[in-house]
């Protein structure tokens, strides 16, 4: 990610049970994980304090345990879910590149490995809020709390609510409006679906 520092983890070996074939999920096989964790390391670099960074040993332990505890048919699903779990677990990580290699992929031909690499990050989104029915403030506050409850969203800031006159000539009550900023792992259409 442009403008951010990165912590690199290359070739973390994990024995896990992912695959389409029953033997793969029953017997298991070796997987190799490589990650680029995108964050600012400036405070950690100036202060020499681990608390200002991300402990890459803990990330490795977490990823190993996560891949061992879950089973997916596709390495695409294993990569997606593990990357999401890392981003949710460590708030300092703004994004990551996650590669999952399957060196023993059962394709029946000589190959070094099969892999999937994904890039995931937190996105900033702005959501407008408004109501002119019933307990307007309660509706808006309920919407904010519903967004706070979404695991893939972090509400960053909520504006004050202001009252505005309706527009368009239709006889109706005044609106109570506001806006909020949130960071989300969801893609735009996924966020719209959650808001719907």
Show which residues each predicted segment covers.
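N-terminal, polar/charged subdomain of small-to-medium soluble alpha/beta proteins
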Residues: 1-125, 131
């Amino acid at each position: 990610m442009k403008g951010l520092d990165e912590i690199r983890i290359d070739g973390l070996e994990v024995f896990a049970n992912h695959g389409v074939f029953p033997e793969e999920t029953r017997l298991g096989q070796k997987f190799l994980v490589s990650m680029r964790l995108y964050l600012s390391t400036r405070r950690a670099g100036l202060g020499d304090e681990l608390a200002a960074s991300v402990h890459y040993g803990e990330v490795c332990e977490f990823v190993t345990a996560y891949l061992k505890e879950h089973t997916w048919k596709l390495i695409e699903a294993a990569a997606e879910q593990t990357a999401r779990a890392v981003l949710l677990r460590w708030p300092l990580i703004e994004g990551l590149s996650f590669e999952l290699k399957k060196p023993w992929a059962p394709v029946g031909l000589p190959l070094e490995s099969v892999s999937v690499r994904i890039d995931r990050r937190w996105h900033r989104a702005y959501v407008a809020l408004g109501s002119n029915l019933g307990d307007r403030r309660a509706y808006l506050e309920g919407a904010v709390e519903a967004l706070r409850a979404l695991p893939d969203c972090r509400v960053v800031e909520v504006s004050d609510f202001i009252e505005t006159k309706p527009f368009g000539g239709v006889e109706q009550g005044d609106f109570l409006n506001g806006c909020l900023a949130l960071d989300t792992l969801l893609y735009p259409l996924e966020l719209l679906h959650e808001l719907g």
